[in-house]
C-alpha cells in the first residue's frame, strides 16, 4: 500500500492529470506521532515548523500551481504549461518526499531492519554498517539542499543509494522506488544542530522506522 500510494501520488502530479471537474486536491497528511515524540534526536520545534509550515507550504503551492496548469491546459496555453513545470516539480516533489519522510520516522525506531530488507542490504552493500556509512556519506555530501535516499531498482532487482537536489522526487528523477529518505534541507535540523549536518545524520538513525521501510520494500519488489 505504501509504495502504491507514493507511486500513485507521483502520477497524479504529472501533466497528464485529468482536466475534469473532479481534480484531486492535495492535503497535508497527519503525523503518526506527536511533534515531540522524536526527542531528543529531533526536537518538537523543528518537527512542528517542518510539518505545519514547510510541508504545508508545498501542499498549498502545489494545489495553486496545478489549478493554473489545468487552466492553461484548457486554454491550450503551452507557454504557461511549460513555465509551470519547475513549480510542479518543486512543490510536488516536496509533498511526495515529506509524505514518505514522516512515515520513515518513529519514536520506536532505530536499530537495524529485519528479514528480507536486512538480507537485501547485506547482499547489495556488504553489511548494514557499510550501508549506513554510505547513505550517511551521500546525505552529508549533498551540496546545498536536498535528500539522501535508499531506493529499489525494479529493473535490476536491487537496492541503490542516491542523492537528489532540492525537492526533486527520487522516482521521477532516477526511476528508483523510494524506500527511505533523509531530508538534509537546513530546515530539517538547523534549529537543533546548527550547521553541523553530520550530527543530525548521526541522530536520525535512532528514529528510523525500519518496519515502514521494510514494508515498502516488500510491496515494491513484487
Swiss-Prot record:
Binds 1 Mn(2+) ion per subunit. The modification 3'-nitrotyrosine is found at residue 58. Mn(2+) binds at residues 50, 98, 183, 187. SUPFAM superfamilies: Fe,Mn superoxide dismutase (SOD), C-terminal domain, Fe,Mn superoxide dismutase (SOD), N-terminal domain. Keywords: Acetylation, Manganese, Metal-binding, Mitochondrion, Nitration, Oxidoreductase, Transit peptide, Ubl conjugation. Transmembrane segments: none annotated. Coiled coil: none annotated. Nitrated under oxidative stress. Nitration coupled with oxidation inhibits the catalytic activity. Pfam families: Sod_Fe_C, Sod_Fe_N. Its cofactor is Mn(2+). PROSITE patterns: SOD_MN. One of its GO terms (biological process) is negative regulation of vascular associated smooth muscle cell proliferation. It is found in: Mitochondrion matrix. It comes from the Eukaryota. It catalyses: 2 superoxide + 2 H(+) = H2O2 + O2. Its EC number is 1.15.1.1. The modification N6-acetyllysine is found at residues 68, 75, 114, 122, 130, 202. Residues 1-24 form a transit peptide. GO terms for cellular component: mitochondrial matrix; mitochondrial nucleoid; mitochondrion. Destroys superoxide anion radicals which are normally produced within the cells and which are toxic to biological systems. Belongs to the iron/manganese superoxide dismutase family. Homotetramer. This is Superoxide dismutase [Mn], mitochondrial. The lineage of its organism: Eukaryota, Metazoa, Chordata, Craniata, Vertebrata.
